[in-house]
Each structure stands twice: as structure tokens, then as C-alpha cells.
């Protein structure tokens, strides 16, 4: 749920917490002197995004930075890794950068994105499943977006689909039988 400004990202990784309510991020920037935390709005506008536990790491170890405003940080130009945490809104995680980068998102067991009726992935993603998580990777992309779901939502979809099909059969079968009887007529 971020959009970066003023930084060229090389790699970005996001780890969604169990339960899907928060995430932690690690973003590499090269020859950058600032970084902004933003959501992309429906028209591409920048909407400030609240993050916490922000830290900057580089050749200086745990480097210092200044806040320009509550959503933009400045630091000495260089290559860094920015670590932070944020909240996931409505099982939806998105991000965009000023230049192409490689992004990976790790979902914990119990969260999934592979059912197109419940989940969503932006184009160019590769999904792999391993023992401890579900990994989604985009290579050389300027933006990513995903919507994940829980097993409960999958069961609700199955129940709704089953009820819908039963209702369809209860309406359609008598209609077809009546039509067949009328077709034979005296």
C-alpha cells in the first residue's frame, strides 16, 4: 500500500503478517536522497499512507534521516535499504515506484490470491507455493497490486455458489417440464 517518490527502487519485498492485517516492507533505493510513502488513488493521484517503525540502513549502518512531512523522508544521497511497517486495508496491497523494480510479496499460510473470483493480481506476477508461505513476484514492474482472501471467504463463495445452483435448478426444471408438456398438447 505504498507509492514511492524521489527514489529508484531496485528490489522491494513485503511480508504480510498472519491474519493479513499488517505488512512489513524492505525497499532498496539507489542514488536516492528521499523517499515518500503514498497510496495511488483511482486517478493515479498520490494519497498519503501512514507507516510506522521506519528505519534507514546503508553503509553507515542504521543511518539518520529527516522527515520533510509525515509521509516523506530525506537523507544524504546514496544507496540504502528502507524498512517499515504498515496496515493492510481490506485485504488489498499495492505499490508503485518511479522506475522498474523487482518486488516480492510473501503471504502466510491461510491467505491466498489464486482464485480469480476472490483474489486479484496485477499482470506480470508469478505465484509460487512453498512450505511456509505463498510467494508472488513481479520482475521489472513500476507497480503491483494484489487482493488476498482467507479460507473462510472461499467457503462462503462455495456455499453461495451451491445455493445459487440449487435455486436455479428449482426454478429451471419445473419451467422446462411445463414447456415440454405444453409442446405435446392435444
Question: What are the roles of these predicted feature ranges?
Answer:
Residues 3-186:
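Lumenal/extracellular ectodomains and adaptor appendage modules
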